[in-house]
């Protein structure tokens, strides 16, 4: 609880954070029951490790792919419910708008991405679980399908937004390596457990690295500046993400960047390999090392990784109350789509924890408070005027966009606006820079 509140610069809603801490143990039990293969000690007990911003090892993990394994566990449980008929799944649909009837959320309009047709869905309540708005920036680590259209539709209908300026810059991303990229690749936070972050002490060494006449392994140990360990001895390389990102940018702005663009620092595992052995490091991070080598063609066992901060997560989102309902009655927002749990900065692994807590242990109970006085309300017809008007407005907007005779693509406009957003975010003197 304290680490989360402090790591978020005391800007999180403490009641929600306290509840998150209370249900955290139950989250692990739930995931184990779903078959998530968490790492275990030799005796069979669950293993854990430190993540950024916490000085206690309390993060349970599944090698370097915890998020993926949690998704597989959740999808397996969902598929079981689909199979027995308790859940109907609509794949390849995109929400276009939320429908309000007498001021309450009563359904949505969605587009079938296979046929292109709009379809109406009525409900007694609507839950938004569509992630954040990181792709407003260019580049980010978010998948391109995470476009925030659902949350923005709710905002346009009157739902409040909270803390939209709070976005997280993740310190361990693979640097930009071309002008054709649509997104950046995130390297797991777990790498900072054993990897040491450094830049050269001498500016001439940094210039040589940028020119390609030297490699990281050619820099003597005495000439390496482990700047996080130097500045923050209590945390070392496991400082909160915002601190690590600002420190990396400061070193690169000072001219100590280590790649051709000058926008990278080293994440070095040579000390861990010497201390633990290559096989132990491979067992812990092998899949991440393989991914890094496939993207960069550099072997991280032999030469230090290059990393640089990149836009990763949005702490802001739709405003919700303690029961996760937005300012629109009947409209709920969970996970990264809401603002409640992280304040100005999210700790490592807390996004997974919040998503699981909201979905498994909070919303199933709080939504019942809202639905309890709706039990007498009959099922809504999608022929109501509100549904007809919402669909008509969407068709009009689509027709307007399709009839624009411009010469720029949507993607090019997104890139331009995203670059402006990143310029503002990285605190350049002006967007022109």
What are the residue ranges of the model-derived segments?
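Glycine- and aromatic-enriched mobile tails/lids
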Residues: 6, 13-16, 30-57, 101-102, ...
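An anion/pyrophosphate-binding glycine-rich loop and adjacent beta-alpha core
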Residues: 153, 160-294, 365-368, 423
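Glycine-rich loop(s) and the adjacent beta-strand/alpha-helix scaffold that form part
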Residues: 125-181, 342-365
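A glycine-rich dinucleotide-binding beta-alpha-beta segment and adjacent secondary-structure elements
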Residues: 90-91, 96-104, 110-111, 284-338
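N-terminal glycine-rich dinucleotide-binding loop that anchors FAD/FMN and/or NAD(P) in oxidoreductases
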Residues: 1-5
